[in-house]
């Protein structure tokens, strides 16, 4: 049986969690939280990182930072994403404006996003998909030209680069996920990167339940008080300790995943006239090899191959169900054909297994089998 995902483990997690028991501080914002934040800051070359209990929480902090209560505000984002991307802003009262995807990348199309900017637009959320980038530098130029903010949903992109810049550090804000389905994880955790300095203090207040606690701890304020509408957004020290062990194993994790990804890529790239898409390796981007996917010629072919792979005890999954045609999206006034490309291509994409317990040869076998099944479908 080839599972779609198996959570990564380093064998150091239990030791670090045992150390939390020795230190006797469990609730969060302690030794291991700071250690994780320092590691992330050094790894991606930024100053301002807040460890969160999820990527969803990181997005929710951004939404609270940008919300002008009482004003009509819009946020542009792709429909092809996880629900949290939209829900974080919808909960804060933003009007959600869904944009089309580029079918070749399955990421937000810059021309369509540009066409939807209005005087009420506060920002654009780009979602980096599968360990590949959504051309953040071009979106940064677009946002700068229109005096709006760029938010990177980099849930799947920790360790990825666009040129020499880490994804998640190019916009005003970057949001990472350390959910157990990601390359590195704490079961459930995340991080917020604040690249726009004017939001650093407020972000810290929101992260600290809306209080100035961090300023009091640093001796910058003498009274502990409520200064902002915030929430409970940081993880426990148990989660942070688990994540610390994972982060320290970044290089090993990266090299293993690259080898497995290469097994898929070598087979698909070596076959011609396939009639479907798969991830493109580009000199402009460096991947973290989070996922390998195939976009087939039609939904029927995709379903046929997914079900046939099950017969070989191989678990493969479809991508996201588009948000604009979901129950909530329909309630917002959207119809499925409002974003025809998103609706069409979301039914044609299949993610193949990729986790550190696989081998390069296993990926090659699955790739060869996928091509064989595609030919079988077309006969």
For each of these PLM feature ranges, what is it?
Residues 92, 145-146, 312, 377:
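Helix C-cap/helix->beta junction micro-motif
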Residues 34-39, 43-50, 111, 123-127, ...:
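PLP-dependent aminotransferase class I/II
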């Amino acid at each position: 049986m080839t599972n779609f995902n198996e959570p990564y483990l380093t064998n150091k997690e239990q030791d670090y969690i045992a150390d939390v028991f020795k230190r006797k501080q469990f609730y969060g914002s302690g030794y291991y939280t700071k250690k994780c934040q320092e590691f992330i800051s050094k790894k991606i070359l930024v100053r301002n990182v807040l460890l969160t209990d999820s990527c969803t929480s990181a997005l929710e902090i951004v939404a609270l930072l940008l919300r002008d209560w009482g004003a009509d505000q819009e946020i542009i984002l792709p429909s092809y994403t996880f629900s949290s991307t939209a829900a974080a802003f919808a909960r804060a009262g933003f009007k959600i404006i869904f944009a089309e995807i580029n079918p070749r990348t399955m990421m937000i199309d810059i021309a369509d996003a540009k066409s939807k900017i209005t005087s009420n637009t506060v920002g654009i959320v780009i979602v980096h998909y599968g360990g590949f980038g959504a051309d953040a530098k071009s979106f940064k130029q677009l946002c700068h030209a229109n005096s709006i903010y760029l938010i990177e949903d980099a849930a799947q992109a920790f360790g990825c680069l666009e040129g020499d810049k880490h994804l998640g550090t190019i916009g005003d804000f970057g949001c990472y996920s350390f959910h157990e389905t990601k390359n590195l994880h704490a079961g459930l955790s995340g991080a917020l990167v604040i690249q726009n300095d004017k939001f650093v203090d407020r972000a810290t207040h929101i992260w600290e339940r809306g209080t100035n606690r961090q300023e009091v701890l640093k001796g910058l304020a003498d009274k502990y008080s409520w200064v902002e509408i915030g929430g409970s957004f940081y993880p426990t020290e148990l989660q942070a300790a688990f994540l610390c062990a994972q982060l320290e194993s970044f290089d090993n994790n990266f090299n293993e995943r690259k080898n497995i990804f290469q097994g898929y890529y070598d087979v698909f790239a070596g076959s011609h006239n396939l009639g479907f898409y798969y991830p493109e390796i580009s000199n402009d981007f460096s991947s973290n090899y989070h996922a390998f996917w195939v976009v087939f010629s039609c939904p029927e072919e995709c379903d046929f191959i997914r079900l046939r792979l099950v017969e070989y005890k191989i678990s493969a999954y479809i991508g996201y169900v588009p948000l604009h045609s979901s129950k909530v999206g329909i309630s917002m006034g959207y119809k499925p054909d409002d974003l025809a490309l998103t609706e069409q291509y979301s039914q044609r994409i299949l993610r193949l297994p990729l986790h550190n317990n696989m081998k390069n040869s296993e990926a090659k076998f699955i790739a060869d089998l996928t091509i064989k099944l595609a030919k079988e479908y077309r006969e």
